[in-house]
Design a protein with these regions (language model features):
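Alpha-helix capping/helix-boundary segments
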Residues: 15, 37-38, 67
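Conserved ATP-binding/catalytic segment of the ANL
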Residues: 129-131, 137-174
């Protein structure tokens, strides 16, 4: 967003009321959150929800931790279908994205890959069928071009013979 000339508002310390005040004051259109912030918003006095004009808010992106289904449902009920979730790592070996409507149809999902492919493998590197839990692996160009800084062994351990890479997370495809 910065490259496009957008203004960034960065709070020195997260505070629920300051976040709402900033959205109103600066007419924030896009924001980035973590699920813990949503939990804190929802624990606030419900009257706080109507004190601020959040109508400028068009896109609320969240990531960095799993978001409990009940929390995300409440946030969509409150803010509307502006929530977008992504799953990725700083290694940038892959990324998934899901919008509010897709998520409501597949609660708990983190979406589809934006590029490349997504695979669920067992401990032997065998692809698992839909619904079975295993290691999450990305395939494609970014999956094979990332590396851990000054750690060739760690980089090798994240790769498979098929050219897939993993952050070490587990999941399943639906």
């Amino acid at each position: 967003f910065l490259a496009s000339g957008a203004t960034s508002i960065i709070l020195e310390k997260f505070d629920e009321e300051m976040a709402f005040s900033s959205i109103e004051k600066y007419k924030v259109t896009h924001s980035q959150w973590v699920p813990t912030m949503f939990v804190r918003f929802l624990k606030e006095d419900p009257s706080l929800r109507t004190q601020y004009d959040l109508s400028s808010h068009q896109v609320a992106i969240h990531a960095a931790a799993p978001c409990p289904v009940a929390v995300k449902e409440q946030m969509i009920d409150w803010w509307g279908p502006i929530l977008h979730e992504y799953y990725a790592g700083t290694e940038y070996n892959g990324i998934t994205m899901i919008n509010s409507q897709e998520w409501l149809d597949h609660k708990g999902s983190v979406g589809r890959p934006l590029f490349g492919s997504l695979h669920i493998l067992d401990d032997d590197g065998v692809e698992l069928p839909i619904g079975e839990v295993g290691g999450v692996y990305f395939g494609g160009e970014t999956a094979t071009t990332f590396e851990y800084h000054n750690d060739e062994e760690k980089t090798k351990s994240a790769m498979t013979d098929q050219g897939y890479s993993s952050l070490g997370d587990v999941g399943y495809l639906d």
